[in-house]
């Protein structure tokens, strides 16, 4: 009888799309094309739902590190389907050190977190305090996803603005956070740009992404353009 890991690899290769593999490898720097099988995201999501109903799926989740990028994507989707909050946080903590690219990081989005925002915020600060690039990025992403609407607190952007990193994928997420904050909490987010609380690159990138957004008014866009730091 085959173990689940062998079965999963066979299924992933059966779902392989070589044209997509070539396309995808160009989007994710630092990941070797040989580690990409080339499974499209909808197929991975569907397979994750199928696997999530199996009692032996934990054997796959425990088999870290995975060899293939697609296994990591599948792993992220499986965690995202978790129904128990505390077990899901544990699964995230186990997996994050092995996340080595923006795509897997950004696909990791547990639905159960929506029901546990009171407890989640402490975990977010912990992830943001990590020295691991994608743990920090994940923490900022969760803050952006869950705390810019009804659960927003004006002190939260200060925690993001205080971050300093030499990592492109951390700074890009900080910019994305503030661009989204400008769309959802404009009056609270604007002072961070007016007072130049971000480093110059992240400041300008946040403005660029905000100006590109359909959720920002024309008047707001004109205001933001004037705040760009000239080189």
Task: For the regions a language model picked out, list residue spans one by one.
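Alpha-helical scaffold domains
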Residues: 1-231
């Amino acid at each position: 009888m085959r173990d689940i890991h062998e079965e999963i690899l066979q299924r992933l290769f059966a779902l392989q799309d070589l044209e997509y593999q070539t396309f995808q490898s160009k989007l994710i720097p630092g990941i070797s094309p040989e580690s990409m099988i080339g499974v499209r995201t909808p197929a991975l999501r569907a397979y994750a739902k199928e696997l999530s109903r199996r009692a032996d799926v934990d054997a796959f989740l425990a088999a870290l590190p995975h060899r293939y990028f697609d296994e990591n994507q599948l792993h992220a989707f499986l965690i995202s389907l978790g129904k128990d909050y505390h077990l899901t946080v544990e699964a995230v903590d186990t997996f994050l050190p092995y996340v080595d690219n923006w795509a897997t990081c950004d696909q990791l989005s547990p639905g159960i977190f929506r029901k546990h925002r009171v407890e989640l915020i402490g975990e977010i600060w912990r992830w943001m305090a990590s020295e691991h690039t994608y743990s920090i990025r994940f923490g900022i992403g969760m803050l952006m996803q869950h705390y810019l609407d009804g659960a927003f607190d004006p002190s939260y952007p200060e925690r993001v603005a205080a971050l300093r990193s030499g990592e492109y994928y951390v700074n890009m997420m900080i910019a994305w956070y503030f661009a989204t904050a400008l769309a959802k909490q404009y009056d609270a987010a604007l002072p961070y740009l007016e007072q130049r609380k971000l480093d110059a690159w992240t400041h300008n990138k946040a403005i660029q992404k905000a100006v590109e957004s359909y959720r920002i008014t024309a008047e707001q866009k004109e205001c933001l353009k004037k705040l760009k730091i000239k080189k």
